[in-house]
């Protein structure tokens, strides 16, 4: 469930949502910025403490999400490339971002 104290609406109508997913053993905290059209503006990995898989923080990998909406698949190995050495982290973050976008579409888009 999303926590209200981790969801912000900006003055220009964009949203910032902070969420967590399980990596391999530890939680990954990330933020999704969504513009007023429902498009992802950016993804930021805020906390990653796993021993391996730090490639998840790679800017080039995160750029794949920019422009995606809730109507896009946002699925690993479909429209999002996987990361060798960070497979579980990449899958869980990708699935989490898809969940954030579904939440935005259902609960925030009309606000």
Regions found by a protein language model. Name each.
Residues 1-91, 95-111:
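Flexible, solvent-exposed loop/hinge segments and secondary-structure transition points
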